[in-house]
A protein has these predicted regions:
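A structural micro-motif recognizing beta-strand termini
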Residues: 17-19, 29-31
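Short alpha-helix capping/helix-loop boundary micro-motifs
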Residues: 23-27
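A generic structural motif
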Residues: 7, 18, 42-45
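Absolute protein N-terminus
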Residues: 1-2
């Protein structure tokens, strides 16, 4: 399952050096806001793991950046 498919209606957990644990839900945030938030975190210098809670998708920073840019 692609990250863009997970974002729609799913909960995506973003762990940034185990310091941040953001839960982004489609029902509480506009899809554009989710994309912008992901872009800001992905562009940061810290290592990042994107993981979808429902399908256990883990994706690397570079791949995630490509997919998010494509989604926008």
């Amino acid at each position: 399952m692609r990250l863009s498919e997970c974002i729609k209606g799913q909960t995506l957990i973003i762990k940034n050096n185990n310091i941040q644990d953001l839960k982004l839900k489609k029902y509480t945030m506009d899809i554009g806001l989710i994309n912008n938030t992901l872009l800001k975190i992905i562009k940061s210098s810290n290592p990042i793991i994107l993981k979808c809670r429902n399908c256990n998708l883990c994706i690397s920073k570079d791949i995630a950046y490509d997919i998010i840019c494509e989604a926008i």
